[in-house]
Amino acid sequence: MKSSMLGRLEQLAHRLIEVDALLADPDSAGDMDRFRRLSRERAELEPVVLAFNAFQSTQADLATAQEMLADPEMKAMAEEEIKAARERIEVLEGELQVLLLPRDPNDGRSLFLEIRAGTGGDESALFSGDLLRMYSRYAESQGWRVEIMSESPSELGGYKEVIARIDGDGAYGRLKFESGAHRVQRVPATEAQGRIHTSACTVAVMPEADEMNDIVINPADLRIDTFRASGAGGQHINKTDSAVRITHLPTGLVVECQDDRSQHRNKDRAMQVLAARLKDKELRERQSKEAAERKSLVGSGDRSERIRTYNYPQGRVTDHRINLTLYKLQQILEGDLNELTGALLAEHQAEQLAALGEDI
């Protein structure tokens, strides 16, 4: 192992001891923001330090086995132990390399999920509803909370556009590679001839912005319009201008929220979504530049890129970025996404390791 890597691991082991001491301090419990920040840091440090401890322990076992070589009666056993220890050290070094890769500071955040119907008309809108259900089921399986922020329903079901907030630790890190064009191939319910139609939806996964630090929005850059909400809403609908449309003049980004009966809450929601979109815009510009430099397959930030096809007749899902095909369409649509998200994360880590090798 390189001395620079060893030094970094020793620093992290020492930092874990410091964090544990700070968490045990009664003052930390009185400051919930500080306590949460330290708890999150500890959760990030612990797997690295545990792997490092295992690495050091295996190195000690190797040294002991090498000393045993001098004893003729113990030589055969020592050689076996040396072989096993060296193999274990190689595995642990690989794990530690991955654990030390630069972390996306947004990985631990909650996210905004935006799904828009694209080509395919009503069938595309129906598929956007299927995608929302898929991600909602996955979020539930992870213990995350899903809240609809804004929706534009289609007459036949599904959505022309829907924005949801998924609230949970690590939500963005797990779902960030879902951004892009999702294509569906199936026979629509309205198709009398049984012909397969192709339609598509665009998915955007945006990390929730930290209002204090991430994005500064100048009120002078905003045009805020209020209007009467449309759609289902019972006796209160169309009686007050509760719906809000916010336009960010420098970028032309527009956010509408009308799902709540309170204008104030609709404005708050619209501002949250706008902040996330502005943060996402910055991220995508940076990712696009990095992807061009590294020829990255995953995480390029290109929303127009067709990333996945859901083929109903064949019961398959294909992710085109990593050439992965799974014949478990129904399970995936029910929220069983771990195999997909895990493969995408592994590919991203492989790209990072390759880039690290180029930089050394």
Curated annotation (Swiss-Prot):
Modification N5-methylglutamine occurs at: 235
Question: Could you describe the post-translational modifications of this protein?
Answer: Methylated by PrmC. Methylation increases the termination efficiency of RF1.
PROSITE patterns for this protein: RF_PROK_I
UniProt key word Protein biosynthesis: yes
| Main subcellular location of this protein, as a coarse class | cytoplasm
Region (Disordered) location: 284-303
List the Pfam families hit by this protein, alphabetically: PCRF, RF-1
GO cellular component terms, alphabetically, are: cytoplasm
Location of the protein in the cell:
Cytoplasm
Keyword vocabulary terms for this entry: Cytoplasm, Methylation, Protein biosynthesis
Q: Spell out the molecular function terms from Gene Ontology.
A: translation release factor activity, codon specific
Task: Relate the protein's function as given in its record.
Answer: Peptide chain release factor 1 directs the termination of translation in response to the peptide chain termination codons UAG and UAA.
PANTHER family named in the record: LD18447P
Q: Which HAMAP family does UniProt cross-reference here?
A: Rel_fac_1
Q: Which family does it belong to?
A: Belongs to the prokaryotic/mitochondrial release factor family.
Q: What's the protein called, per UniProt?
A: Peptide chain release factor 1
Record organism: Bordetella avium (strain 197N)
The major lineage groups are: Bacteria, Pseudomonadati, Pseudomonadota, Betaproteobacteria, Burkholderiales
